[in-house]
Amino acid sequence: MSQNQQREQLGSRIGFLLLAAGCAIGLGNVWRFPYIAGAYGGALFVFIYIGFLLAVGVPILVMEFSVGRAAQRNLGAALQKLEPKGSRWHTFGPLSLIGSYLLMMFYTTVAGWMLAYCWSMLKGDLSGLTPEQVGGFFGGLISDPTSSCLWMGVAVIFCFTVCGMGLRRGVERVVKFMMVGLFALMIALVVRAVTLPGGEAGISFYLMPDPEKLTGGLWAAVTAAMGQAFFTLGLGVGSMTIFGSYIDKSRSLTGEALYIVLLDTVVALMAGLIIFPACFAFDVDAGSGPGLVFVTLPNVFNSMPGGQLWGMLFFVFMSFAALTTIIAVLENIVAYGIDVLKWTRKKAVTVNFVLVFLLSLPCALGFNVLSGIQPFGPGSMILDLEDFIVSNNLLPLGSMVFL
């Protein structure tokens, strides 16, 4: 069976849309977006961010789709097939693959934290803890090398198992289930958050522009919004190119890109409607960085009636968002082995499982065994370096290749 025939095995257009949206919808929407929006003034940042999505994100997404549909391959093989004779565009293929590996090096660690919190919420480990104890719980998780590597490994094993099941029976079926579950959980969480007493102040902060709330200056907000637009769509490393190979030639690439950007934006905005009303209702800082998800929100859930249930649902939702992105990016990595190196799917999955797990260890160990490595000075971690390389450099620069 040819590779082209294999790609046509996606069961439906909705399968394509949810799969591509699953790649875009991830921690960038529900872990990164709310705390960055909170740090840069709420609504004003949101408007700048949406402007970048429409002006830059959609055109580059269309370009990535067009390369994939024209070649019916992943980015590495597509560039080899489409480049003019004598040119060297194909050299970007391995570079884009490196970008995907770098993204997975820290993404899998954070996904592992989400899974750990799901399990802990289910068992009630965080129920009744004081704010200091909740902070100590997160600190204990990331400072324990065994726990960090174990939960990172669970995320890697699960996602590669899905990829190993094949495109249609594994990737499409699992991601469709997770995406439907993600939207259902999100709606329930939004309804609960916006009905909290005092939550209207958070809604106002989030949706009403106020330049006086803009900390760090307008230029800082603009650059943060641009980086977030590239990060959330996964542009610049070729992850979206492979999904272009699944688009029927009768479909408009711009239309499909707009649908995916719309789904991605809805999730990001709804994540804010979960987090900001909850934070304002319980008088906590909505711009407190990644600790917002792992320390602040568990304290909020502990203050709510039925908080254990809502906390568990929230971290299931977060896990779905993280895992769908990992599965989609890993499918792109696996496809490189199949299309370019002519490996079987089984070999591509096996080799890359070992590689991704080993590459993810520095980040998982960066908060404990390797905590002495502080690339940006005291307090910084290996995760910060990997995030900076990907979000602020590889994604924007890689996107320029498609222009």
Regions found by a protein language model. Give the residues of each.
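Juxtamembrane helix-boundary/capping and inter-helix hinge elements in multi-pass membrane proteins
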Residues: 39-44, 70-75, 85-88, 124, ...
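Inter-helical loop and helix-membrane interface segments of multi-pass membrane transporters/permeases
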Residues: 4-8, 36-40, 70-95, 108-168, ...
